[in-house]
Each structure stands twice: as structure tokens, then as C-alpha cells.
């Protein structure tokens, strides 16, 4: 799949009374190309869940615009998107078999029964949803989402309830979905090591805005870990620095060549990079060209 999956311009969302409410998103602008597996990362309260809800058409922004799969109204493309929120809302009185049947009935012409049955795999079909564990409900919710054959999957902390084996299995399924069908996946998670091996795109949200955005590889390569005696870090942008004894370790955003005579230079892991930015909320933003929003095409705020 080519094109743009999600694009935001000055996106804002405030909950509560105007002027005195909670601002979950504030002048948030970015672009997500289609066909990527995107890690949506940030501290608690950064706006990740709000962004996913808006992209799923579960609300309207109070400022700016949000385009999903080319539509200025995300609600118009719900049949082409799948959303698994944190609370996995399923009907507790239904059985697993009833739930899968409902998925097929609600998605005529798109339903992939074989995929849904494969993901639901070990779940007893006669078991009622209310009797399932958190991890089992997650598996059923993902079976519904993948069975829909969406062009865009929005997953809010999807793996938190899963044991390591199930997590590994379902991450493999998600990767295959992108490789085989070009599905765009946006996945929020606090398990940074898991994201590093699975995601090729990054949106780091803090304070209601995207602070880092682009190809994960490009964002990592734009930074360096410098270790050495306390010295001059200019002209590089310092994201975080720490001193232990007479040795300084700094994560910098490179502005030209690094003086290797003064510093030992290594490339940070994605986890090291994200942890440093989590500890340094005032670090300047970085959006690669692919993540920079283009010209505004319309306004979809309330």
C-alpha cells in the first residue's frame, strides 16, 4: 500500500469545559505513510490514547484536522480500519463462537474467517467472554480486528495482558499482516524492547504533540551516545547528559561530524533513545521528511 495512512495538522483535543478543560492534544502535526508498523510511544497522559481514538473515529477534535486513509472524517472509513482499545470492549454474555459470528455479520465482503479462527485458536468456542482471562480477551479482540482485513489497525497497549509466548506469536502475526497485505499498524506500548524488534516507524508523543517522528532507523542514526572526559559537546544538540566521576555520557543529536579523538561514539538502541527523551521532555523535536505534515487539505474539528 502506498500513500498516507494518517495525517494531522494542528490537531487539538480538549476534554471538559472550554478554557478550563484538560488539553490531551495540542497543535499536534505529523504524517504516517501507509504500510508501516508504527510504535506510538510516550509517557502516561501524553495523548496516545486520545490520538488513537480520534483516528478510529471515536470522537472529533476540538482544533485542527485529521485525515485517515485519505478521508477528512475518520468515521467515514471505519469499515477499512480496526481499533483495539485498552479495555477490549466485548459483549460479556456472548460466547467466543457468537463473537466471531458477529464479526463476520458486521463485516460482509471483508471477513477472513480463516484468519480469525487461527488467531482465536486455543479459545474454547463455547466459553462466554465474561469467563475469559485478560489475555484471552485480548486474543479474541485481535481475532476480530485481523479478521476484518483492515487497511489500518490501531492498537492501544495490545500486548499488556499476554504471556510472553502469546505475545511473541501475535507479534509475528501482525508482522506477517503488514508483509502480506500492506496493512498499516499503529501500536502503543510501554514494552520498549518489544517495539524495537517489530516497528519500523516511530511517533513519540509528549505534552500532546509529536516530539519524534519518522523511520525508526533514521531517528536512531541521527543520534549518538558520546562517552569521555567532560568536554565540549558543541555544535551537537544535547538530549541528555550524565556524569559519573570524571566521565561524561551524553546522548546528542548530531550536527555534523563527531570528534572521535575526544569522545567514544556508539549508536544508541531505540530503547536508550526513547528512555533519554522520556527523561528529557524539553529536548527539541525531530520529524523526518516522511513524518512532516504536508499542506492542510481540510478541517475536521468540532
Task: Give residue spans per PLM region.
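ABC transporter nucleotide-binding domain
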Residues: 168-252
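The feature captures the beta-strand-to-loop junction immediately N-terminal to the Walker
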Residues: 41-43
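ABC-family P-loop ATPase nucleotide-binding domains
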Residues: 87-140
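Helix-to-loop junction immediately C-terminal to a conserved catalytic motif
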Residues: 56
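Conserved ABC transporter NBD signature motif
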Residues: 63-77
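Catalytic Walker B motif of ABC-type/P-loop ATPase nucleotide-binding domains
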Residues: 153-157, 162
